[in-house]
Structure formats: structure tokens, C-alpha cells
């Protein structure tokens, strides 16, 4: 038999140690054995796991934050799942509840009275206070300048913060006699207590979670509203769009090494055989409702009903989410952390060609635009989700992924005539995805199988999502590698058939088939070049042929080409001239869009408007720099962009993509979702 692996669980009390040893005795005979390691505190456990003296422990959000910091760098590998009315979930939302009829907004909170669940609690303290510090509403210079409680006492006129002992003002609004009213478990503590404090008129705002009003006063729900970060108010049920942060469930953390699979197979097995609804006399979780605090929440929270595996790419920062992560960061800040870069925009550039263009833009914009350089679009989406970069212009396929990751479209590129430009577009601009073949071939949409294909890149709209979505609907198979005999789809696995025709940059073998301008056949022009030199069909957009024939493209491969050398494939099996794309196309799709985090959207919209006045097609400074044009392929923006079109505030990525396209990408992504999409789907499902 193969040697058994041991998983060393870290415990922080004798009650936990006892439960852990009992679990060891009840374990189903598995290839994994359990040993229990007791430490004094969760921080000692984090250190022990980091030093390879233990393997795993389940922690709450604030502790997951610490475990993820250097030097420990632990990552969440499984999330606890809790039951809620309407299904199971792995998170809740922190909200600010106010009475309807009071007319103040988030910016008017200074001098108001406030109700909190308790000092140091997520929804009641860490998130609201961290957020107000992050927004620079509460002025606090960090630990050096005194404890954050003093800064909060200066901000609100009076509060009830159960457990606060340093500042009298922070429990002035609490209920009870002088001795007990400030206690952690006083009458106004917890979610229902903080809500009662608002109800009794002791506070103007209560910081609670999204279910609190429903659980305490369902029939009075209409008398309350939520304060949103964007400066508006919304009904109590709109907590998904009007919350201060999503609070992640407790998570099991571990070192980022090969042991993760063993820990998960051990956890999955135990949760299955010893979890809720099993006949075992040992309970892995709970049961809930224990009276003795010493016996509560041992190893896992009592309210957990199961564990859910966390996708590979997830780290603590993605797991906790931007709002929660920044709130905790703001509460722990010392002098070293930088304040928010309010009037700058951190643009995300991909590869060295975009870097040099972005650096020039940064110089001419007097530093209003700064650049973050990464290897591909996916890395940029992660960076923006984490708040370490602000914006990037993406193809619709990536707008989908970015949307699932919580980013929103801010402006769209427009390529048609300039009449579109002056209009404030409610509707995004569109283009057509087409399939182009050589006129001399006998190929139709119905006999494409086994031919040689050329794609702009995996995951992009015209080059991949549309044609492969249609093929997927037709064949029902996810084996795209088998459909064409060979091809070039930059971003495919290096040994796949769909990298066979790719060329790289000619300088570096490792660059063959990469999804960036380092691959000759990347993008629209690249895919057309691949058709001319090697392929049978190219999946591009309606204008690509016109942009590269009759001398428009001076490169050797395009010499002598005319429109008449090519035809379009229609989905009904017919063929058409390349100018007939309005009647013969694979789909009508939205243009590229700049995406950003929702709370940055307006800032970026304004900033881009200003930049376009200077460096756009008719910019006053376009001799110095042109933001849409570039020497090589489409850098930062598509080169044909005539202008950026403002999208209406609050537009969702689904609306931007349109039903037809959204459905096609969603269906395609059931096949093999990228690691990033798995992470964001996990977070979106919460």
C-alpha cells in the first residue's frame, strides 16, 4: 500500500485538541491520517503552518488576512458553507441601515450618532470604520497617532460600540446602567442589538449585516433604507449592489505547496461521512445552539454545514475581496501605507510594446496616468480586482470575465464614423464577428471540421468565443482541439493542435503561441496573416480585411492583396462578399470596453474624457501623443478607435455584452473555464 500522508491540524484550546483527537478516532480509514498540534493562539498556528510544523487551521476573515501576509503567505484552500434562507452561502454583506425619511448620505456621516455590533467585529466595526478611514472621511494617521477608537469618537457625535472601553463617547448611546452598558454582550450588542439601537432612536445609522432587518422587523422593512458607498440610498433588499463589503466565510488555510490536495481529500471525506445529516455520533460541525462559550465553534464554526474547495488561483486578497481587504488594511495601517491615489489612474499594460506606449502616455499626462505592466489580460483583471491597478481596455470576451470578477464597463471604443462620438451613447457600439476564407477555396460553414483555423486569441470575441460557441452548440463537445486539424489560437496549451501553425516572434521559441503581440499571428491582423500564409479560415471582425488590403498594410505578407481574394462564410452554409458583413456574419458583438472597479468608474470616466480632449483623434495635444494610434498592433486601445463612448452609469456587463453574446460566452465557459473565471465564479456565487 502507498505510504499514508499525515495531515497535522492546528488547535488553539484543550477543548479543540480534544475534539481533534476524537475526530482522529472516528475517522474513516483513509490514505490520510490525522495528527493534532496544539498551540496557544491562532497566530502561533499560522507561524507553525508556515514553518511546516503543522498543516491547516480554519480562520475568520481578519485572521485569513494576517495568514496571507509575508512572511507566512498562507492561502485559503477550503471555505465553510453556512445555511441561509434561500440556499447555502459562503459569505454575508456588511450594510449601513438608516431610517427612511432622514435625508443624509454617506458623505454626511460626520457628527451623526452610530450603532455598532461590537468593537473589532467585521460588519459592525472593521468594515465601516476601515472604509471611512480608507475614504479619508475619518482622519487617522495610523497606529502612531493613537488608537483608531479615538479617531472614531471625534467623527461621530456619540455611539454605541459594545466592548469599547477607552472612549466614553463610544458607549454613550448604549442601554443599561453605567457598569454594564459598555460590555461586549450588553443589550445593544450583536446584529439585533445594533438594529434595536437604531430603532430606539439612539443612533442615526446601524452597521449590521444584510439579513438583520429581515430577521428582526420583516414587517417594517419599508421604513428602513441602506446607505451606499456611491453616495445614494437603496431599499433594504438591494444589499447586493449597496453594501460596504462582502464578508467571506471562515476558511481553512495552508501553505501553498503540494500538500493542499491531501488536506482537501481528507476534509472532503470527513465532511461527507461525519458532517451534517450523518448518523455518526461525532459531529465535524456544531451542532449549533451550544450554551457554553468554551465549547462553541471548535475547529469549525458551529453553523457550518459543509466545506467547499477554493479554486487554485485564489489567494487571501482575492478571497476576502477588495472592500473587506482594504478596510482591514486601513485599520492596521502604520505610517508606511500610502493613501488612496485619488487623482491618478493606474493603467494596466500588457507586454513590452504596451509598456513603452503607456510610459509615453504617463509622461505627457503629467503623471495623471501611471502604468502597471503585466504579462496578460487575466493578470490585469486580477490586479484591478485587488485594487492594485485601475483600468484596462478589454475585448468583450474578457469583459465577461472581468464582469464576473466584479468589474464594470466604463466607456466603449467606437470605430464607426465620428457622428457616434458626440452622442452620449446609452447603447454601446457594435461590430460584426465574421469567418473569412480565401475565395479560391471550397469551404463553407458546414464543412469546416478538419480544416486549418486562425484565431485572434483564446477567449477573445470574434476570434474564439463566437466561432467556438457556435461550434460547441452544434457538436455539444468541449474538445475544440479535435475539431480543426491544426491552427493558431494564441493562448492555447503549447503542445495543442491549435498552436501548431503559430510562429512566435521569430526571436524566441518560448513566445510561440503566446497571447500578446510577441506572436506574429496574434490579434485581427495576425489571424488574417495566418490565413494568407497557412490557414483555411480566419475568425476576425468585419473590417479586418479592408484594413489590410490594397496597400493599407505595407508589410511584405500583405503586398498585392485585394478584397476580392477573400469571402465570408454565412452560418446558413452560403458565402458572401467581404462587404456584405451586415447580412453574412457569425454574430453582432459589442466593441471593446474599458473596465474598472465600480467605485472608481466615475473617476476613470472623467479622467479619460480629459485625456481624450488632449490626445484623442482631434485632441489639442495630439502632436505630442495619440492615445489610440500605435506603431505596431492595437496597443492599449484598438488603433481604429475614433473616440470613447460614455456608457450610462450603472450599466452591467451583461447589458453591455447583450443577450446573444452573453449566452454564447456563458455556454462556452461551461467547457473549461479559465482558472481566473473559476475564482470569480466562486466569489460571485457567494
Curated annotation (Swiss-Prot):
SMART domains: TR_FER. Transmembrane segments: none annotated. Signal peptide: none annotated. It comes from the Eukaryota. It holds the Pfam family Transferrin. CDD domains: PBP2_transferrin_C, PBP2_transferrin_N. The keyword Membrane does not apply. Residues 333-341 are annotated as: Connecting region. SUPFAM superfamilies: Periplasmic binding protein-like II. Keywords: Disulfide bond, Glycoprotein, Ion transport, Iron, Iron transport, Metal-binding, Repeat, Secreted, Transport. GO terms for molecular function: metal ion binding. Residues 7-333, 345-670 form the Transferrin-like domain. One of its GO terms (biological process) is iron ion transport. It is found in: Secreted. PROSITE patterns: TRANSFERRIN_LIKE_1 (PS00205), TRANSFERRIN_LIKE_2 (PS00206), TRANSFERRIN_LIKE_3 (PS00207), TRANSFERRIN_LIKE_4 (PS51408). One of its GO terms (cellular component) is extracellular space. Disulfide bonds join 10-45, 20-36, 115-197, 160-174, 171-182, 228-242, 348-380, 358-371, 405-680, 421-643, 454-530, 478-671, 488-502, 499-513, 570-584. InterPro entries: Transferrin, Transferrin-like_dom, Transferrin_Fe_BS. Glycans are attached at residues 473, 548. Transferrins are iron binding transport proteins which can bind two Fe(3+) ions in association with the binding of an anion, usually bicarbonate. It is responsible for the transport of iron from sites of absorption and heme degradation to those of storage and utilization. Serum transferrin may also have a further role in stimulating cell proliferation. Ovotransferrin has a bacteriostatic function. Its concentration in avian egg is the highest concentration of any transferrin in vivo. PANTHER family: SEROTRANSFERRIN (PTHR11485:SF31), TRANSFERRIN (PTHR11485). Belongs to the transferrin family. Monomer. This is Ovotransferrin. The lineage of its organism: Eukaryota, Metazoa, Chordata, Craniata, Vertebrata.
